[in-house]
Swiss-Prot record:
CDD domains: AAA, Caliciviridae_RdRp
GO CC, alphabetical: host cell endoplasmic reticulum membrane; membrane
Source species: Feline calicivirus (strain Cat/United States/Urbana/1960) (FCV)
GO MF annotation list: ATP binding; ATP hydrolysis activity; cysteine-type endopeptidase activity; RNA binding; RNA helicase activity; RNA-directed RNA polymerase activity
Superkingdom of the source species: Viruses
Keyword tags: ATP-binding, Covalent protein-RNA linkage, Eukaryotic host gene expression shutoff by virus, Eukaryotic host translation shutoff by virus, Host endoplasmic reticulum, Host gene expression shutoff by virus, Host membrane, Host-virus interaction, Hydrolase, Membrane, Nucleotide-binding, Nucleotidyltransferase, Phosphoprotein, Protease, RNA-directed RNA polymerase, Thiol protease, Transferase, Viral RNA replication
Protein name: Genome polyprotein
Domain SF3 helicase per the UniProt entry, residue ranges: 458-614
Domain Peptidase C24: 1073-1229
């Protein structure tokens, strides 16, 4: 393959050599050939794209070659071509000899023919797929600009474009499937190009494209890697285990023979016939032989038929394959069975049916396999061929990906910066993947090709970096111009100044030339005589250089295209005092950017005056440049005397300030300071640099401190770099700066108090602080000395640079590696450690390469750790501290550092899963080696077999303890336990702190489990103790002790190493631990006859209690009274008691999410029988982090809605405390006579009603029809001009014939869909944050209402009574008090609520009678009304009205705006909050009510419950509202799955709290997805205003930067966020001066901040009137209330006055017309009068007289009009 590839690539490159060598001798031949071709070639419609690349085009001459490759005319046959020296040289590596031009053209012509004709003999050795793959590979290896020289390149590009157009609109799954199944390299390349293109534009197509591209670029899937090799490896492992590793191989041999049945198998194969029926018979006989007929008989026919169909559809290209499988004769081969097996194996490995050439090679290998030895050799040859062909497929796949990425690297495809950055990241991923393949020993022969692919990707990476750099700002350079007469020494001074500014040689730019390829980009740039040429626009050139915008230089060389100007200091020289005339348009911009130094040489000038005409002697010039006079002009001085006029009029009107005289040193210092000051704003944003340390000393001590720091670096083998001054140099670690007191520095500073050479002796013992005399913590010292920037892989090793080993680990298993790596990782890096461990398990022989690849993506801890890994693949040394360095060695290198003995390498078997990384030759060699060992073991004597058995028995486990030690008494139990000093201290401190008596083995095992992330209680507590110990590790001080022994320095601890009691978790970073039990008021204790506690029970209501059977068995008492009426169902049981607890808990048959103390629960919730100390119990296994104790049985496990789903019945004890056994809730009928009416009867069967699953009711309540809205008499003719009309009236309405029932059903369907909402842990954390935020202004323990009538009078009496009583509340009241039916209903519900029992959560459904937009009327869209039960509303008002009022009373400060008056100064407070934010987002939501998650609503109700007094009334209200709502209409009852009914009590407050929780969850999830751990209260760092689904979010810049992800998370929760105006598009920040909230535009008017009501809402007040109920809404009402109607129009005029005079005049005309036609006694106010009235009411000067708060009359925001 590599030889043929060299031919393809060398075809063009070699042509340049031989064309020049034979140009003269072949001139006449070329002329004749061109003439002949011109006469003989047929006319073509378009020119051949390859003609320009050849002397004689092979595309055009190939047409005269026959399909069989024979000779016809002047081109020789293929057989003759292969005999030429040119063909031989092409296939060899020696290309020093010249290639004959004619032969080269003939070879190219035949290759062209072979690509177009499958029967050409060249295809015998290579199939068309291979030839095409070679050309694609050549494309990938060449730069994109050189690919046009390849054969068929344009054709392949066109093919890929056609595939792109065909597949571009396909989904991602389809494209990924195509990559795995397609065998067309052009199609695969096109698919990769589509995936990568959409990944680069993932903002438009979705982030999943980018994530999928990153994942798939790292994967190369093949059948042989994933299935075939592991299968064969497992077979070899099993064979070894049963033979070589079997202590009794002789006993196994008969079983092996009986299992394989070799004689029967040989007879079946010998009688095989190569026909379709023969293959069916042979395969069926083999299946019968091994008893697998039944499991495969259904697929045998389809397998054989499918394979032959594929062969039959093959073209003539596969002629030999057809002949092989359809008609092999005896003279060709004795039996084709093995050929068929080899062909199938070749297909599985390479993915292609073997072509003629490959089958010929297979046939040649198998033809001579007549003996055992020759068969083994043939098998090895086949394995080598298969490995080579498989490697070819891998290289082809990498080539396709490289071509796709390289073709996307152009500005027309990846145009914006984001797409370039993503393309850069993908190119780096593929580059690293190819680099990993270069480390694979199987791919060593393909390393030249892989390196070329990496070179192509390097070009892409470089190009992307250039394109990124062009789009970014750069530091503004400093430009100084040295002006003066010729010969004064300006240029020499400029060069000397450049040396003082930088150690680098200066770059030089000459403006007389228009290209700058010689520019090197060094820190200092010199432009000599920049204004010498009048043809150059040097003013604009200088302005472009001294700018923050990138400056692209004009370069001629292709590799320099895109070169940027990057120098920091620019030194120019000029002979002109005024380089740019002040009258120039660019003079201001020019002089603002440059500083001019007037240079004079007084000695030279005096010599010229005294001796004119003589040369200036050398004595007039000094080495220290003291002969020069350097005068620095003031800012914008265009000459020595004047400054530019800012107005650009009189440039000689402003005198220049006196100059500042400098020397060469002070000038260099001034330029450095100017550069620092000019770019200070960019450095200030970076903040304090934590990797820079400054050591401040006096000027005379600088060199001594530098030597001391270098000695420290050498002594500790540190990674930091020592620098003198504040300028830093490149370093792999921190930088230590030696500073003087007056130097500015951005980093940590330490004052050196002891500085002398004698301090070097103090370095012994690592006393660095004492040697330098600095007060520096050990943590900072460790960070300074050992911090590593990034991840570094070292291929070359120097022993003096290796760090001292702290740990040496022999990798005998995966767990050794995982346990050692945990020392290097942060907690966030544990997942990467597990992945690395799995990779090592699957490929242990590639440990160094895998560690090298794994290290690039993991995060390391700040502790300094050095570990040496002894692996079968070599030695790996890993050093980490923030970053990491790794050395991969092929030999043992163990240095001092506590290692007492050199460990021996581990022995990891290379088979099983690791077989996928081994070449086929090694797999078959392992197989034959195993067979040889088995054979030798059988032939040898019994003594050898006995010895083998004795040898195998060595590895059996031995007893470790006898006698007194067998019970593991004593701390050092077991054998082989060795602890380091640090581990010993940890063990002692852990036992002492936690008051435990753990052995060393148990301690190490506990630490191991905790490191791997176990969630049992012991592991969780150990991690907490470890974190606390780590935080206190540095709590010590250096003290001086003066005693009898003299003066000595010691370190004493300021705090003990013990775990810290965190108390209440205010970090919000993790779930809180065990806390208060759920349903505390509903839990009671079950005792025995003596009063001893046995367990717990939970009150279900009405004196019925639930517990577990083993607690209730025997004589059991509850509150001193014997229980009765005990019923059991398995382990779950119920009983009755006359003692009733103050509250009750709801029960539900579902899966729990929390244990009794609030900790998360992990369970599959599948009941199984378990053996316990109380017998066999059927329950569900669960794990929690809470430790339980005997007597906790019966405590409740709850779901997200607070419903009890199971009871605790057992735990795993001290050994496995996290294991819990939970008895699920099952229904037990404990009912007596019902005490309350309930519509929804669970005992009735489910029915389907218009697509809804519901229960049928005994009574039918129809949906009210008609409307009370009528057209005003003033607009009977023009009412259609109004944008709104009354909502659809049902099937008889011509505007929309949709029935009211259909409207209700369509509205209810979204409520029946399940909405998950945010993740459990995220919601729980945000709930804690919101409670903590509200606690600042909402008191706790707010008392609930104890009077039923007082609670009832808090309700709105104009609303429905609900499903149990018809009409409105005020219809059932006499003299302000409820009548008997209403009072009886309230009393029944109140009685249950006082016992804490949840009430039926049922609503009656109606449709809102309101004005709707005309387009929504046509669609039949109406809003539903959920009529809540008056009893439930009364109980909820008693429970939560006080909490709700406390929240709404603080709307000016909190996030909930319920209760705000938008026509009062409150709107000014809102405006103040809005304008103080960095970014403001106004958001509305579609279908808000139906998309609410029940878990979020339950969390909001729990917030209300948190601030209440937790009375039984509160328990009843909370449990009622958290239960699923039931909608009742048309005689059916529907239980909904999600959503929040609009008629739910306190719906506005609950909706607003839901809104806060949703936004908080979205922000938290977005930040932590970006790697930002949220340990603070989010609601304290941003502001928001919510009123139901209306929201305004005031985000800081950190939140605004992830706003797209925040709104994406909200959509993922099931919500539908939209813009306020409902327009299509992403939600963007809005102008804070015009925010829309609650249909009001908060803006500034001449009268101040006002909330302007929508104009259309004001206008439609004049078109419609509320009157009697009717279906004829176009007819005016029979009677009009002049008082309420007049007040309504008066208010409309007041609101209109805030929109200005022009709009008010329009409203004034409508008001006059309404007064005239409606016969009202009203005089509409003038504009100024209306304005005055509104402002007086706004400021509270005038009492309001409108009906805005009266729901029974026509007001601007009542249910009649949509505001």
């Amino acid at each position: 393959m590599s030889q043929t590839l060299s031919f393809v690539l060398k075809t063009h490159s070699v042509r340049k050599d031989f064309v020049h060598s034979v140009k003269r001798t072949l001139q006449r031949r070329r002329d004749l050939q061109y003439l002949y071709n011109k006469l003989s070639r047929p006319i073509r419609a378009e020119a051949c794209p390859s003609c320009a690349s050849y002397d004689v085009c092979p595309n055009c001459t190939s047409g005269s070659i026959p399909d069989d490759g024979s000779s016809k005319g002047q081109i020789p046959s293929w057989e003759d071509v292969t005999k030429t020296s040119t063909y031989s040289l092409l296939l060899s590596e020696d290309t020093s000899d010249e290639l004959h031009p004619d032969d080269l053209v003939n070879v190219a012509a035949h290759i062209r023919k072979a690509l177009s004709t499958q029967s050409h003999p060249a295809n015998v050795d290579m199939c068309k797929e291979q030839l095409t793959s070679l050309l694609v590979m050549a494309e990938a290896m060449l730069p994109q600009r050189s690919r046009s020289t390849l054969p068929l390149h344009q054709k392949y590009v066109a093919a890929r474009l056609e595939w792109r157009e065909k597949f571009f609109s396909k989904p991602l799954d389809f494209l990924l499937e195509k990559i795995g199944t397609s065998r067309d390299i052009l199609q695969i390349t096109a698919v990769w190009k589509i995936i990568i293109e959409k990944a680069c534009y993932c903002k438009s197509y979705g982030e999943h494209w980018f994530e999928a591209a990153k994942q798939k670029l790292r994967e190369i899937k093949s059948y042989e890697h994933n299935t075939l090799k592991p299968l064969i490896g497992a077979f070899i492992d099993g064979l070894r285990l049963m033979t070589i590793d079997n202590p009794n191989p002789m006993g196994f041999l008969p079983k092996l023979i009986g299992l394989i049945k070799p004689l029967n198998l040989a007879m079946i194969i010998d009688n095989h016939e190569n026909t379709l029926s023969g293959w069916v018979i042979t395969l069926t006989a083999i299946m019968e032989l091994y008893n697998i007929t039944e499991c495969t008989i259904d697929v045998i026919t389809s397998i054989i038929t499918g394979f032959y169909d594929k062969i039959g559809k093959a073209t003539k290209f596969y002629s030999q394959i057809k002949a092989l499988f359809t008609g092999f004769r005896s003279e060709d081969v004795a039996n084709s069975f093995w050929y068929m097996a080899a062909a199938i194996l070749c297909y599985l490995i390479t993915g292609l049916i073997p072509n003629n050439g490959r089958l010929s090679k297979i046939k040649a290998c198998l033809a001579g396999a007549t003996t055992l030895v020759s068969g083994i050799v043939a098998t090895q040859k086949l394995a080598a061929m298969f490995a080579t062909w498989n490697s070819e497929s891998i290289v082809n796949e990498l080539s396709a990906r490289t071509v796709a990425i390289s073709e996307l690297n152009n500005p027309t495809t990846t145009s914006d910066t984001d797409s370039v950055e993503r393309l850069l990241e993908l190119a780096k991923i593929l580059h690293e993947e190819i680099k990993i393949h270069t480390l694979n020993p199987i791919m060593q022969s393909y390393n030249p090709i892989l390196r070329n692919l990496m070179s192509t990707l390097d070009g892409v990476i470089t190009s992307c970096n250039k394109r990124k750099a062009i789009a970014k700002k750069r530091p503004v350079p400093v430009c100084y111009i040295l002006t003066g007469p010729p010969g004064c020494g300006k240029t020499t001074a400029a060069l000397a100044l450049a040396k003082k500014l930088s150690d680098q040689e200066p770059s030089v730019i000459n403006l007389d030339v228009d290209h700058h390829d010689t520019y090197t980009g060094n820190e200092v740039c010199i432009v000599d005589e920049f204004d010498s040429s009048d043809k150059v626009d040097y003013a604009n050139f200088v302005i472009g250089m001294v700018n923050s915008a990138p400056m692209v230089l004009n370069c001629d060389m292709l590799e320099n295209k895109g070169k940027l100007f990057t120098s920091k200091y620019i030194i120019m020289t000029s002979n002109s005092e005024t380089p740019v005339k002040p009258s120039s348009r660019r003079a201001g911009a020019f002089y603002r950017r440059v500083t001019i130094i007037d240079v004079a040489n007084p000695l030279a000038e005096s010599h010229k005056r005294a001796r004119p005409g003589t040369s200036v002697p050398r004595s007039c010039y000094k080495k220290n440049f003291s002969h020069l006079s350097l005068a620095k002009r003031g800012a914008e001085c265009w000459c020595k005397e004047y400054v530019l006029d800012p107005k650009g009029l009189q440039h000689q009107s402003i005198k220049a300030p006196p100059p500042t005289f400098l020397n060469i040193d002070s000038l260099a210092q001034t330029m450095k300071q100017d550069f620092t000051l000019k770019n200070m704003a960019f450095e200030a944003e970076n903040g304090h640099s934590e990797h820079r340390y400054g050591f401040v000393c006096q000027q005379g001590e600088v060199e001594t401190v530098r030597r001391l720091l270098n000695a420290v670096r050498t002594r500790l083998n540190a990674t930091f770099t020592v620098c003198v001054g504040s300028e830093a140099s490149s370093s792999i670690g921190c930088t230590a700066h030696v500073l003087t007191p007056d130097e500015p520095f951005n980093g940590k500073k330490y004052v050196v108090s002891r500085c002398n050479e004698a301090s070097l002796s103090a370095l012994e013992g690592n006393c660095v602080q004492s040697a330098l005399g600095v007060c520096m913590s050990t943590k900072d010292l460790t960070h300074l000395c050992h911090f590593i920037r990034g991840k570094i892989v070292n291929d070359s090793v120097r022993l003096d640079e290796l760090p001292a080993n702290q740990h040496v680990v022999t990798v005998n298993s995966v767990f050794d590696l995982a346990w050692a790596l945990r020392r290097h990782l942060t907690l966030a890096g544990q997942f990467q450690a597990i992945r690395a461990a799995y990779d090592v398990l699957t490929a242990p022989d590639k440990v160094p390469a895998m560690l090298r690849h794994w290290m690039d993506e993991t995060s390391f801890s700040d502790e300094h750790v050095v570990t040496q890994f002894v692996t079968p693949g070599g030695i790996v040394i890993l050093e980490s501290c923030g970053g990491a360095r790794i050395w991969a060695l092929g030999h043992n290198v163990i240095r001092a550092g506590g290692v007492t003995a050199t460990p021996t390498g581990g022995c990891i078997r290379f088979m099983g899963l690791s077989a996928q990384t081994m070449p086929w030759s090694e797999i078959f060699r392992e197989l034959f080696s195993l067979l040889g060992r088995i054979w030798s073991s059988i032939k040898v004597s019994t003594l050898v077999l006995t010895a083998l058995g004795m040898y195998a028995s060595r590895f059996r486990p031995k007893s470790e303890a006898k006698g007194k030690t067998k019970s593991k008494v004593g701390p050092y139990r077991g054998r082989g336990v060795a602890l380091t000093d640090d581990e010993y201290d940890e063990w002692r401190e852990h036992n002492a702190t936690r008051k435990l008596d753990l052995s060393v083995e148990d301690f190490l095992m506990l630490r191991h489990r905790a490191a791997l992330g176990a969630d049992d209680a012991d592991a969780v507590k150990f991690r907490s103790w470890w974190n606390s110990r780590s935080r206190l590790a540095d709590d010590y001080e250096d003290v001086t002790v003066i005693g009898k022994g003299g003066v000595k320095h010691e370190k004493i601890r300021t705090n003990t190493l013990r775990a810290v009691d965190r108390g209440y978790d205010v970090s919000f970073a993790e779930e809180s631990g065990p806390g208060t039990k759920f349903h505390k008021n509903a839990i009671g204790s079950v005792t025995d006859v003596c009063g001893e506690h046995k367990g717990y029970c939970v009150h279900m209501g009405h004196g019925v209690y639930a517990t577990v059977a083993h607690v209730a068995k025997g004589d059991s008492f509850f509150l001193g009274e014997r229980i009765f009426d005990l019923k059991t169902n398995g382990e779950f049981c119920c009983f009755r008691s006359t003692k009733i607890l103050p509250s009750a808990a709801p029960f539900f048959p579902g899966k729990p999410t929390r244990d009794p103390w609030g900790s998360p629960v992990a369970t599959e919730w599948k009941p199984k029988p378990y053996t316990t100390t109380s017998g066999k119990i059927v329950g569900c296994f669960a794990t929690t982090s809470t430790e339980t104790h005997p007597g906790d049985c019966g405590l409740p496990y709850i779901d997200d809605n607070g419903r009890v789903t199971g009871l605790h019945t057992g735990s795993g004890g001290p050994k496995t405390p996290s294991a819990k056994l939970v008895v699920p809730y099952v229904h037990i009928d404990m009912k007596t006579k019902s005490v309350t009416a309930q519509k929804y009867d669970v005992t009735k069967p489910d029915i389907s009603y218009k697509g809804l699953i519901c229960k049928q009711l005994d009574e039918i309540r129809i949906i009210p029809k008609g409307t009370r809205l009528h057209v005003s008499p003033a607009h009977t003719e023009d009412f259609e001009e109004c944008s709104h009309q009354p909502a659809s009236l049902g099937s008889g309405d011509p505007r929309c014939p949709k029935s009211l029932t259909a409207i209700v059903v369509d509205s209810l369907k979204p409520y029946c869909d399940k909405v998950e909402g945010p993740p459990h842990d995220i919601l729980h954390r945000v709930q804690k944050m919101l409670i903590d935020h509200l606690s600042g202004f909402v008191p706790v323990n707010i008392s609930s209402e104890t009077s039923m009538l007082s609670a009832f009078h808090k309700l709105n009496h104009d609303t429905s009574c609900g499903p149990y009583l018809g009409g409105r509340k005020k219809d059932h009241m006499t003299n302000g008090e409820p009548d008997k039916p209403l009072l009886d209903l309230l009393s029944a519900k109140w009685k249950l609520a006082t016992q804490g029992i949840a009430l039926p959560h049922e609503y009656t459904i109606g449709l809102k009678d309101e004005l709707r937009p005309v387009e929504k009327v046509a669609e039949g869209k109406r809003r539903m009304i959920w009529g809540c039960d008056v009893g439930v509303a009364t109980v909820c008002a008693a429970a939560f009205k006080g909490v709700s009022d406390a929240i709404t009373a603080n709307h000016q400060y909190g996030p909930v705006q319920v209760g705000i008056n938008m026509d009062s100064p409150s709107v000014e407070a809102l405006h103040q909050r809005i304008k103080s934010a960095a970014k403001v987002y106004a958001v509305d939501y579609s279908k808000w009510d139906s998309t609410q998650s029940p878990r979020v609503s339950a969390a909001s109700i729990d917030i209300l419950r948190y601030f209440s007094d937790r009375s039984p009334i509160v328990d009843s209200a909370a449990n009622t509202l958290k239960s699923p709502p039931i909608a009742i209409f048309n005689g059916v009852a529907v239980k909904v799955s999600s959503g929040l009914p609009s008629g739910m009590p306190l719906t506005s407050v609950i909706n607003s709290l839901n809104h806060c929780l949703y936004v908080g969850c979205a922000i938290l999830q977005s930040l932590e997805a970006r790697g930002v751990p949220v340990t603070w209260n989010l609601f304290s760092t941003f502001d928001m205003m919510t009123y139901g689904d209306d929201g305004v979010y005031m985000f800081p810049m950190m939140f605004a930067s992830v706003s797209d992800q925040i709104f994406a998370n909200l959509s993922a929760y099931g919500l539908k966020p939209t813009r306020v105006d409902k327009s299509v598009g992403s939600i963007e920040p809005i102008d804070p001066e015009s925010v829309v909230f609650l249909k009001r535009t908060i803006t500034r008017t001449p009268q101040g901040i006002r909330g302007l009501l929508d104009r259309s809402s004001i206008i439609r007040q004049f078109y419609y009137i509320k009157g009697e109920n009717s279906d004829d809404w176009k007819t005016p009402p029979k009677s009009i209330d002049p008082t309420s109607r007049g007040q309504q129009l008066w208010n409309a005029c007041l609101y209109a006055s805030q929109h200005g005079v022009e709009f008010y005049n329009k409203i004034y005309k409508l008001a006059q017309k309404a007064v005239e036609y409606e016969e009202l006694h009203l005089e509409p106010p003038t504009y100024h009068s209306a304005l005055e009235h509104y402002n007086n009411q706004f400021n509270g000067v005038e009492a309001r007289s409108d009906q805005i708060d009266s729901s029974g009359m026509t007001a601007l925001h009542c249910d009649v009009f949509e505001v």
